[in-house]
Amino acid sequence: MRVLGIETSCDETGIAIYDDEKGLLANQLYSQVKLHADYGGVVPELASRDHVRKTVPLIQEALKESGLTAKDIDAVAYTAGPGLVGALLVGATVGRSLAFAWDVPAIPVHHMEGHLLAPMLEDNPPEFPFVALLVSGGHTQLISVTGIGQYELLGESIDDAAGEAFDKTAKLLGLDYPGGPLLSKMAAQGTAGRFVFPRPMTDRPGLDFSFSGLKTFAANTIRDNGTDDQTRADIARAFEDAVVDTLMIKCKRALDQTGFKRLVMAGGVSANRTLRAKLAEMMKKRRGEVFYARPEFCTDNGAMIAYAGMVRFKAGATADLGVSVRPRWPLAELPAA
């Protein structure tokens, strides 16, 4: 059984083909980073137009890469939300149209379920149950996962997501967009302990996050200490340490609350090396396991949508003839498979 996956929720056009016996057969990705760099962030209208230009050619490339034709595809999965409404509509329209033309089922996929299941693409996939840390530019959530579609929200950011805070602080430090990875690179040159940032909401019970205050703290620190290269690196180090420590503290609480021994982290920020190292060390001390996808599957991609589509297809999920998307779509609303 082979599923074509289409991802167009934001600023990456991702196309992949997944086979339930052979695994990933094709994976094509186009990033719009250069398109949006001059604006310092994603411009929704530009993103939508670029998806229109790139989606079909990438599908053709994926078929070529896999050596397959349309007749070999058993279902078409597409990201139906959450995300930018115009960008979502491009992928949904193409996906639904291809499914109709090829006479195969269309499978709407939740973008964050795609991220959550991305580690399943690895050679050593996690088993249920586990705590999932979904950490990206748009979301920071802790989820109790006991099966496909069996998701309980334990905590989430009440303001900025961790990835958004990374990008905003990077901009304050004079780094280009997207700044998160550049900030982490700069932080590696920083001196630990010169500056100490707060660990937001760790001094009270609960599993919610708040990262907007760290951006303000960074702005004040930059104002008071100047912007020479070493100072900027030290501020980047302090900021990254604060975010990573906050995520780690909340993960500990979630694991204690659920009693689970497995931690899965997914989303763009899960590619952060410092975060990976700290959580791996934490889980080793707890005699548990931590799982994450390879870096290219942490950011938005078609492979995770193709895989999630396969899982949902086997559970009987299909879309009707209409094209609909959900820019806001709580993960907990998904049905169990």
Swiss-Prot record:
Protein name as it appears in the record: tRNA N6-adenosine threonylcarbamoyltransferase
One term of GO molecular function: iron ion binding
Localization of this protein: Cytoplasm
Residues involved in Fe cation binding: H111, H115, D300
Disulphide bonds in the chain: none
InterPro entries: ATPase_NBD, Gcp-like_dom, KAE1/TsaD, Peptidase_M22_CS, TsaD
Enzyme Commission number, as recorded: 2.3.1.234
Gene Ontology terms: biological process: tRNA threonylcarbamoyladenosine modification
CDD domains registered for this protein in UniProt: ASKHA_NBD_TsaD-like (cd24097)
Taxonomic lineage from the root: Bacteria, Pseudomonadati, Pseudomonadota, Gammaproteobacteria, Enterobacterales
Required cofactor(s): Fe(2+)
Species of provenance: Escherichia coli O1:K1 / APEC
Enzyme class: transferase
Keywords noted in UniProt: Acyltransferase, Cytoplasm, Iron, Metal-binding, Transferase, tRNA processing
A GO term from the CC aspect: cytoplasm
Keyword Cytoplasm found: yes
Catalyzed reactions per annotation: L-threonylcarbamoyladenylate + adenosine(37) in tRNA = N(6)-L-threonylcarbamoyladenosine(37) in tRNA + AMP + H(+)
One Pfam family of this chain: TsaD
